[in-house]
Amino acid sequence: VRFIMTDLRSGATAATAKESASKSKMGTAQKAWFKQELINARDSGFPLIVWVCPDPWIAPAQLGDDSWGGHVTERTELANFIRDNRITNLALISGDMHGLAFDDGTHSDYATGGGAPVTVLHGAARTSDGSTKGGPYSGGVFPGNMQYGVLEIYDNGGPSVACRFVGMKVGEGRKLTHIFSGSPAGSKDHAIVNIST
């Protein structure tokens, strides 16, 4: 499994800036690096690529929003890149929403004309008040504090991995579960298969 972490603050254009091809959450250098990392992970045959994305990917377009909804041109650019380069085994661990949620790809496809659904996982908040940010999410949303997410990856050395995401609330236990598998990108149209929710 290949984990890729990005910084969406230090090189970002203000969310209040007018939408354009130059408006960016990543900045030019990091975006080029990120795209190359996706290609490298695909070409290396990793069964799963996990993007640790500090901000919610799923969100309606809204100028000034701090999620990817405030940078829709760049989000579409990245989604088109993911689709065009057959990065079919990408899952996102997203931050900056104070709640538990997951999406199985139903609401996460921002490529022009479709073709780039990704699994999105949210596991928070430890101490902050609960809130819902972005969405909708196919697995629902559980806002609140004293929560966390666990992504378990089972690898038997074969060409695929099995994954289970569990959203937990301290004192109450499991609030949501999403089980999926990942196979090397390019091996099929959708290398992430949803097993159960």
Labelled PLM ranges:
Residues 1-197:
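Metal-dependent phosphoester/phosphodiester hydrolase catalytic core
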